[in-house]
From Swiss-Prot:
This is YcgL domain-containing protein A1S_1688. PANTHER family: PROTEIN YCGL. Pfam families: YcgL (PF05166). It comes from Acinetobacter baumannii (strain ATCC 17978 / DSM 105126 / CIP 53.77 / LMG 1025 / NCDC KC755 / 5377). Signal peptide: none annotated.
Amino acid sequence: MHCDIYRSSKKDEMYIYIARPNYPDETEQADPFEKVPEAVLQAFGRATFVMHLELAPTRKLARVNVLHVLDSLQTKGFFIQMPPEGLINPNAVEPEGLRGA
């Protein structure tokens, strides 16, 4: 399964994978986001193209299970990769130099 990956303008490390089932035999330029609900597009913000990728069940992806991605691409036409959790701890103690700033 071929797909294009776009980065979100609203949230760091949020990506959307868009299915390209007819690649490389596509004859016309269709709207790549036509299957993505409007509410998802609003939350995602401006999409910036990152790369084209060919996915297979044996391929490893850094943060998501490729089987979940493939299933979503086949059933919905897209997959949203959310930012990793736990990178910023809102309860962390402030560094010494920033207290009271």
